[in-house]
């Protein structure tokens, strides 16, 4: 009956991987109650990467099914002059991997965000760190996020969400659609430039053109 003793099961399950814990939870109710305990699951999830602490809990339990390196990411706060290419070089990752992780269709999608998630290229960077389980609103996925600067800052509003305008909802939609076609970018990027131009489409196009010129001069395209 030792395999039904809770204390014995905890000692055994502490040595299991995430996948093995999932299998153990299917054996019987007793095993399930132990194998799904938060402490055991978190320990198994973080153990391969030697993470010191995992803060937060995912909205979906399916998050725990896989603890591959792709479940972790670095949070990079966007600064003026950043581009997907320059960040790929900085963090030694592929451009397509950044775009895929962040659910970006074009490089200009960077301008509609206050941060990007950067894939982990060197697992050693996770050792003895604190990661935060977050649902990224742009990437539309839950990830364990590492903040190289120490801790997450209070979330900033999405550019353009607090802009006041006399346009109707339909008028705004048409304006954004027109800018999107002119700039050949996604809606988020068009909305960003419209926001920093305080609703003036001509100024938005000028700002966008200025950024493109800067990128070309800096050799980032």
UniProtKB/Swiss-Prot annotation:
Pathway, per record: Protein modification; protein ubiquitination
Domain of life of the native organism: Eukaryota
Endpoints of the signal sequence: none
Domain (F-box) ranges: 7-46
Keyword set, alphabetical order: Ubl conjugation pathway
InterPro entries, sorted: F-box-like_dom_sf (IPR036047), F-box_dom (IPR001810), LYSM1-4 (IPR045030), LysM_dom (IPR018392), LysM_dom_sf (IPR036779)
One Pfam family linked to the record: F-box-like
Residue ranges annotated for the LysM domain, each copy included: 74-118
Known function: Component of SCF(ASK-cullin-F-box) E3 ubiquitin ligase complexes, which may mediate the ubiquitination and subsequent proteasomal degradation of target proteins.
Subunit structure as annotated in this protein's UniProt entry: Part of a SCF (ASK-cullin-F-box) protein ligase complex. Interacts with SKP1A/ASK1, SKP1B/ASK2, ASK4, ASK11 and ASK13.
Domain notes: The F-box is necessary for the interaction with ASK proteins.
Name of the molecule in the record: F-box protein At1g55000
UniProt organism field: Arabidopsis thaliana (Mouse-ear cress)
